């Protein structure tokens, strides 16, 4: 809730990741700090269609920001999407998340017109990566 209010779609996915992500062919990734065994970042790969997946729910703890954790998670989810045979990886975000948008561009995502109304009121940017 630091940047946006938690919406019903957030509650649904975060409240049942096994049912909403994993059972549908997706996966949740975690970054764990060395030594402390503490989760410092996470993101999800959500299967949308046979050849399309979404990078979603990326978050990095305050103490881990600026330490390339987001980059490592992004690279890992891209590698996983390729290994699973997806041809396109998409994401929805908000332009005020400037560091995140810069990261997505660094990972190769390209801004595209928003193709359909989002489940989230905060979405004002849509990006795609051809795998």
What are these regions (language model features)?
Residues 87-131:
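C-terminal "cap" of GNAT-fold acetyltransferases
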């Amino acid at each position: 809730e630091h940047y946006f209010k938690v919406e019903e779609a957030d509650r649904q996915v975060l409240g049942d990741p096994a049912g909403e992500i994993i059972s549908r062919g997706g996966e949740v990734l975690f970054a764990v700090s060395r030594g402390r065994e503490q989760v410092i970042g996470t993101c999800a790969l959500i299967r949308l269609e046979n050849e399309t997946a979404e990078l979603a729910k990326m978050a990095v703890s305050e103490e881990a920001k600026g330490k390339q954790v987001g980059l490592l998670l992004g690279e890992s989810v891209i590698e996983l999407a390729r290994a699973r045979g997806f041809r396109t990886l998409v994401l929805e975000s908000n332009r005020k998340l400037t560091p995140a948008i810069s990261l997505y561009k660094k990972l190769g995502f390209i801004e595209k017109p928003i193709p359909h109304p989002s489940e989230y009121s905060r979405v004002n940017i849509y990006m795609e990566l051809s795998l």
